[in-house]
Amino acid sequence: MLEKLIKNFVAYMGVASELELDADGSYVLPISDLVRMRVRQNADEEIIISAFLGEIPASMDIEKAYARMMEGNLFGHETGGAALGLDSDGHAVLVRRVPGEVSQEDFANYIESVLNHAEAWLEDLGLSKMEQE
């Protein structure tokens, strides 16, 4: 189901490049120059949409950045229902779980929502494109 959703989505977006799978089996979506997007299905058949925002630089007030992220997470208002946090490498990431049985239209809306919120958080946290790579 996920593979079909992904293929239809990238075709709709006009992406000509071949879909990539990363080391953990997630699809890498080549739809943004600012945010690295990945999509996978978990053991519960939920779809996990992840947007990697990058490392919070040491020059930044880390406590202030973490507090801002916690405020944004509260009730999901500033994250579109996604969760904003840190991965095991200390990089900021925005993650949204959605039902595995989702329509193509809803899937596209979820991807768009995560991407839009991720780009807003890049600006809010002051992370640049260089920090995404």
UniProtKB/Swiss-Prot annotation:
Q: Extract the SUPFAM superfamilies matched here.
A: Type III secretory system chaperone-like (SSF69635)
An individual GO BP term: protein secretion by the type III secretion system
The UniProt entry, under InterPro entries, shows:
Tir_chaperone
What superkingdom does the record give?
Bacteria
User: Which family does the entry's similarity section mention?
Assistant: Belongs to the chlamydial CPn_0713/CT_663/TC_0034 family.
The protein's name: Uncharacterized protein TC_0034
Organism annotation: Chlamydia muridarum (strain MoPn / Nigg)
Q: Lineage in the entry?
A: Bacteria, Pseudomonadati, Chlamydiota, Chlamydiia, Chlamydiales
